[in-house]
């Protein structure tokens, strides 16, 4: 199976690198700067679960992409999706499967609008990693899980073939799911709650718990779960219990990646994670925590845009 990994950042680089390590036929679609970095230093993974280095990994540029692949693994930020689709369009053929690992659910509609629904799979991952200053992928803990499946829950021939490439021997915890839409919704509920409350409080979980805001975190989780239920995907009790425990854990250093991006002055996936969920609410409440968190992040984005505009004058 020929696998195209779109980008070689923290997520795509990690999972693609582990697939390379396991002997899979992997090519990275990268921009010229990242291509030069990989040619010079190789693909480097530093992880508690084992380091990996592949000198001169297989790469291709958008301009040189000439034929379809069997599987496209997509892990870009949601705000980069349009450009990413343009870059890998020539890799999508009649039998190509696209496995996106983006946050939220809106990307499924965007991808289907471009390529049709046939190629699309559902997918999600759990990993904490970043790209170091030297271009190495730094993995922080022992979590490196990826679940995937047909969006209708079927066990198609193609999903079984993909599972044979990924499950058990790919160098990370891969799992074929018959309920991938449910799992994607449960993850969205959690990350929206975590992003919303840590960004709103501008603090780690432990800090806002110490300040007495545990009830706000729990309330935001309940609100997000209610929206999911209204869409037909009531989060299961076990998923809610795990999320509640994480979001109310005393002393926890956890910050959502959205807050880390805000602290770094970077772009954020505010509309994809928070705004889209808010729009799906049956009866939006002007004083809802989700609305307040969404507007808080929008204000950051507006201020960031104003700052960039002023800097160009």
Where do the model's predicted regions map?
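Residues at the C-termini of beta-strands that transition into short coil/loop
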Residues: 30, 49, 63, 102, ...
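NAD(P)-dependent Rossmann-like dehydrogenase/reductase catalytic/cofactor-binding core
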Residues: 218-313
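NAD(P)+-binding Rossmann beta1-loop-alpha1 motif at the extreme N-terminus of oxidoreductases
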Residues: 1-51
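Short, charged/polar "capping" segments at the starts of alpha-helices
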Residues: 34-37, 108-109, 156
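Short, well-ordered alpha-helices that flank and scaffold nucleotide-derived cofactor binding pockets
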Residues: 17, 21, 86-90, 113, ...
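Internal alpha-helical scaffold of NAD(P)-dependent oxidoreductase catalytic cores
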Residues: 90-91, 113-121, 134-238
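Rossmann-like NAD(P)(H) cofactor-binding subdomain of soluble oxidoreductases
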Residues: 52-136
């Amino acid at each position: 199976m020929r696998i195209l990994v779109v980008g070689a950042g923290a997520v795509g680089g990690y999972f693609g690198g582990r697939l390379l390590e396991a002997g899979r036929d992997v090519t990275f679609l990268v921009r010229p700067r990242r291509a030069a970095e990989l040619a010079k230093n190789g693909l480097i993974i530093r992880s508690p679960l084992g380091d990996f280095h592949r000198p001169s990994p297989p790469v291709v540029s958008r301009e040189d992409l000439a034929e379809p692949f069997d599987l496209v693994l997509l892990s870009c930020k949601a705000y980069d999706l349009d450009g990413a689709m343009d870059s890998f369009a020539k890799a999508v053929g009649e039998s190509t499967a696209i496995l996106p690992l983006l946050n939220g659910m809106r990307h499924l509609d965007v991808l289907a609008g471009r390529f049709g629904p046939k190629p699309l799979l559902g997918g999600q991952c759990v990993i904490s990693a970043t790209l170091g200053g030297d271009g190495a992928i730094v993995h922080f803990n022992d979590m490196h899980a990826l679940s995937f499946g047909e969006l209708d829950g079927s066990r198609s021939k193609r999903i079984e073939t993909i599972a044979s490439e990924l499950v058990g021997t790919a160098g990370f915890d891969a799992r074929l799911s018959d309920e991938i839409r449910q799992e994607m919704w449960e993850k969205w509920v959690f990350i929206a709650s975590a992003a919303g409350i840590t960004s709103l409080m501008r603090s780690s979980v432990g800090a806002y718990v110490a300040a007495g805001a545990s009830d706000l975190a729990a309330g935001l989780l309940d609100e997000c779960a209610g929206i999911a239920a209204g869409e037909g995907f009531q989060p299961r009790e076990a998923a809610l219990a795990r999320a509640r425990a994480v979001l109310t854990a005393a002393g926890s250093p956890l910050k959502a990646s959205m807050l880390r991006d805000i602290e770094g002055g970077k772009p954020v996936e505010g509309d994809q994670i928070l705004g889209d969920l808010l729009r799906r609410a049956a009866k939006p409440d002007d004083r809802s925590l989700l609305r307040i968190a969404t507007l808080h992040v929008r204000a950051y984005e507006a201020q960031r845009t104003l700052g960039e505009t002023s800097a160009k004058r």
